[in-house]
Amino acid sequence: MTEAIIIDGKEFSSNLRNKIAEDVKAFKKERNVVPGLAVVLVGEDPASRIYVRKKEEMTTAVGMNSLSYRLDANASQQELLDLIETLNHDPAVHGILVQLPLPKHIDTPTILEAIDPDKDVDGFHVVNAGRLAIGTPSLVPCTPAGCMMLLEHSLGSLKGKNALVIGRSTIVGRPMAQLLLAADCTVTVAHRHTKNLEELCRQADIVVAAVGIPHFVKASWLKPGAVVIDVGINRVPAEDEAAKAAGKTRIVGDVDFVEAAKVASAITPVPGGVGPMTIACLLNNTVQAARNLTSAS
């Protein structure tokens, strides 16, 4: 049996960042403007700090301005709203990202809706969600955008494909379904409570797993030759007994990768698949936002 092609998100995202760097260079020459991405971090969550640092490094690497804002964990919601309002009106800022999760005393939807939709490079604002739903050009959530790039790279045209999205979050599942519809797929959205999930999987040419449960999707569910995009990032105990006893962990996806790779024609690994694409698409959105904002001014 032929093993699946491993879809290398690291390599693809590296090539995409190189292209973005060229776009930034051309944009600077054309409009004499440097795209600026403002990243706001509230508190000292260790994982968030790592993500923010990666975003800052990659923003600078492609030639854009990286603007960092740090608020204390007990900063008030109004303080954060005031900062966002300032960034909304700052002409040097073309993209605004508020790192999630936020402290419990801050209402996340209120914060996300306060960001100027034209600077909402995460694509989470209700205006951008609405634009996506009706097929109007918009800033698209980064993870689904990255998934689409990987699918189109693997399959070429997606027209007429049966696509199953397992997961219904506003960050991945729902926008993913909208993007697949726009690409002329026949789309089914399922979740952990869907009764005939295995049957739906066996009919799908494309399976996007974004349910947040380790190894939820089994190889036996898959249609032979399906393309599998695993969005899951789940931390589980290390396989090695000594490492497990020491409390060490490893990252796995929502798909049983080893067995699924024996059935699928192509599959993303975890880590190294979808994850690297998310930051690259964030940078891509920032350049797009800068173009939109400067052309409108």
From Swiss-Prot:
It comes from the Bacteria. One of its GO terms (biological process) is tetrahydrofolate interconversion. CDD domains: NAD_bind_m-THF_DH_Cyclohyd (cd01080). GO terms for cellular component: cytosol. Catalyzes the oxidation of 5,10-methylenetetrahydrofolate to 5,10-methenyltetrahydrofolate and then the hydrolysis of 5,10-methenyltetrahydrofolate to 10-formyltetrahydrofolate. Pathway: One-carbon metabolism; tetrahydrofolate interconversion. Belongs to the tetrahydrofolate dehydrogenase/cyclohydrolase family. Its EC number is 1.5.1.5, 3.5.4.9. PANTHER family: C-1-TETRAHYDROFOLATE SYNTHASE, CYTOPLASMIC, C-1-TETRAHYDROFOLATE SYNTHASE, CYTOPLASMIC-RELATED. InterPro entries: Aminoacid_DH-like_N_sf, NAD(P)-bd_dom_sf, THF_DH/CycHdrlase, THF_DH/CycHdrlase_cat_dom, THF_DH/CycHdrlase_CS, THF_DH/CycHdrlase_NAD-bd_dom. Pfam families: THF_DHG_CYH (PF00763), THF_DHG_CYH_C (PF02882). It catalyses: (6R)-5,10-methylene-5,6,7,8-tetrahydrofolate + NADP(+) = (6R)-5,10-methenyltetrahydrofolate + NADPH; (6R)-5,10-methenyltetrahydrofolate + H2O = (6R)-10-formyltetrahydrofolate + H(+). The keyword Zinc does not apply. It comes from Zymomonas mobilis subsp. mobilis (strain ATCC 31821 / ZM4 / CP4). Keywords: Amino-acid biosynthesis, Histidine biosynthesis, Hydrolase, Methionine biosynthesis, Multifunctional enzyme, NADP, One-carbon metabolism, Oxidoreductase, Purine biosynthesis. Homodimer. NADP(+) binds at G167, R168, S169, I233. One of its GO terms (molecular function) is methylenetetrahydrofolate dehydrogenase (NADP+) activity. This is Bifunctional protein FolD.
